[in-house]
C-alpha cells in the first residue's frame, strides 16, 4: 500500500495553496469545503479565485512563493505550472514536517487527493496512488450512481441517535445488528425521502422495543425489457438489499445475477396458461413474507404498471397495511421499439401510440378494433405471440390493409434480440418459420418501415438480428 488512507480535520486550520490558475481553483474549492483557513500565493489569480478572495473566503498573498510562507501551516498544496517551484514547495514543506501535495506529481507528494463522493457526513474516497487519476475518477462516477444524495441525510439521522442506541444496546454485536436493520429498509427509505418525522417516531419505537419486530416491506420493481444497463439506479439498489425476490418468466436471467447473492429466490411463473402460482397466491405471499420482517423484492419485466398486474398486488398490500414502494421500469414497448429502430411516433407516420394485450379473455381477443384500426397510429401488442394470426387477421377484418407494416421483436434489448419485419398478412408466417417465442412484442403501423434504415443495435455478428420479409 503506497499511501495510507486517512481523513484530515482541517476546519479553521491554516493551509497554503501555491498557484493561482484553474488547477489551483479546484484545490481551493476542496479545501474551503473542508473549512480550511486558506491562503493563496500567486502573482495573479484566476477570476473565480479572485472572486473568492474578494468575498473573504480566502486570503490572497500577491507575489511569488517564499519558504517563509509555510511557517505555521498545517498543510500545503503546490499547484503551479512550474515544476521547479512545485518541487521547492514540497522540499520546504517536508523540512518543516508539513503535509504537502504536488499536483500531478505523486513522487514529490507526502499525500495525494483522492476522487471524492461527498454525502456529508458520509464520505467515500477513491485513489489510484496517483498513478492513474482518470481511473479513480471513473470509479467515483460509477459509485456516485449507487450512493444517492439521501445517504448524507441518513448518516446525520443515525448520528443523532447514536448515544441512545449505545445506551439501549451495550453489547457491540447487538448494536451492530440493530443498526443493520435500521439502515436498510422502510425506515431508511423514509429518511432518504425526506419524511424524517415519521422515521424518528419509528426509530424511537424500535429503540424502546429493543430492536424487535423488524418491519418488512415490499418493493415492486420494474426490471425493464431485459438489458441490465437499462435498470434504474433505484431498482439496482433495492435488488442488492432484498431478503427474498419473487420473479417470473419475463425477467431476463442476466438481471437475476444482480440480485443479492444470499437472497431467497421464488419463481412465480406467469407464463401463458402456466402460472407456477396463481395471482391471488402471489398477492398473499407478498403479505406473508413482509409480515415476517423481510424486505421483499417483487421483480417484474418491463414496468410493473403496464400489463404487469402491479396495481392488484399493491392493492392487496395496502389492504393489509404493508409498507410498499413502486419503482418504474422502461416498459417493454419502449425498449423493443428503440432497440429495433422503430420509433413509436413519427411526424410523418404516426401521431399516437396505443398499448394493448393480445391475451384472450373468455376465449376471444376483446379489443376496441374501431379505435385500433385508425390511420396514423402505432399499436403495440403485449403477450400476443400465441394469438398473432388472430390478431393480424382482426386488424385486416376491421379495416387495416393487409399490406400494413408489422414487426415482432423477441428478447428485446438483449443479445438474443431478433426482429422480424413484414406485413399484417405475412407476419404470423414469419414468426412461425423463424420460431419467434415469448417474450416478444408485436408492433403494427407504418413506423415499422423505418426499421430497415434505423435499426442500430448489434452487440456482435450473431446478436440482435433483424429479419426482413423477402
Swiss-Prot record:
Pfam families the UniProt entry points to: CysG_dimeriser (PF10414), NAD_binding_7 (PF13241), TP_methylase (PF00590)
Biological process, per Gene Ontology: cobalamin biosynthetic process; methylation; siroheme biosynthetic process
Annotated catalysed reactions: uroporphyrinogen III + 2 S-adenosyl-L-methionine = precorrin-2 + 2 S-adenosyl-L-homocysteine + H(+); precorrin-2 + NAD(+) = sirohydrochlorin + NADH + 2 H(+); siroheme + 2 H(+) = sirohydrochlorin + Fe(2+)
Similarity annotation: In the N-terminal section; belongs to the precorrin-2 dehydrogenase / sirohydrochlorin ferrochelatase family.
Keyword set includes Cytoplasm: no
Swiss-Prot/TrEMBL keywords: Cobalamin biosynthesis, Lyase, Methyltransferase, Multifunctional enzyme, NAD, Oxidoreductase, Phosphoprotein, Porphyrin biosynthesis, S-adenosyl-L-methionine, Transferase
Source domain of life: Bacteria
Name of this chain's protein: Siroheme synthase
Chain residue ranges for the region called Precorrin-2 dehydrogenase /sirohydrochlorin ferrochelatase: 1-203
Modification Phosphoserine occurs at: 128
Keyword Oxidoreductase found: yes
Residues reported in the UniProt entry to bind NAD(+): 22-23, 43-44
Protein role: Then it catalyzes the NAD-dependent ring dehydrogenation of precorrin-2 to yield sirohydrochlorin. Finally, it catalyzes the ferrochelation of sirohydrochlorin to yield siroheme.
UniProt EC number: 2.1.1.107, 1.3.1.76, 4.99.1.4
Active site annotation, chain numbering: 248 (proton acceptor), 270 (proton donor)
PANTHER family per record: SIROHEME SYNTHASE (PTHR45790:SF1), SIROHEME SYNTHASE-RELATED (PTHR45790)
Pathway noted in the entry: Cofactor biosynthesis; adenosylcobalamin biosynthesis; precorrin-2 from uroporphyrinogen III: step 1/1; Cofactor biosynthesis; adenosylcobalamin biosynthesis; sirohydrochlorin from precorrin-2: step 1/1; Porphyrin-containing compound metabolism; siroheme biosynthesis; precorrin-2 from uroporphyrinogen III: step 1/1; Porphyrin-containing compound metabolism; siroheme biosynthesis; siroheme from sirohydrochlorin: step 1/1
Annotated InterPro entries: 4pyrrol_Mease, 4pyrrol_Methylase_sf, 4pyrrole_Mease_sub1, 4pyrrole_Mease_sub2, CobA/CysG_C, NAD(P)-bd_dom_sf, Siro_Cobalamin_biosynth, Sirohaem_synt_dimer_dom_sf
Binding site for S-adenosyl-L-methionine: 225, 301-303, 383, 412
Annotated segments matching region Uroporphyrinogen-III C-methyltransferase: 216-470
Annotated GO MF terms: NAD binding; precorrin-2 dehydrogenase activity; sirohydrochlorin ferrochelatase activity; uroporphyrin-III C-methyltransferase activity
SUPFAM superfamilies the UniProt entry points to: NAD(P)-binding Rossmann-fold domains (SSF51735), Siroheme synthase middle domains-like (SSF75615), Tetrapyrrole methylase (SSF53790)
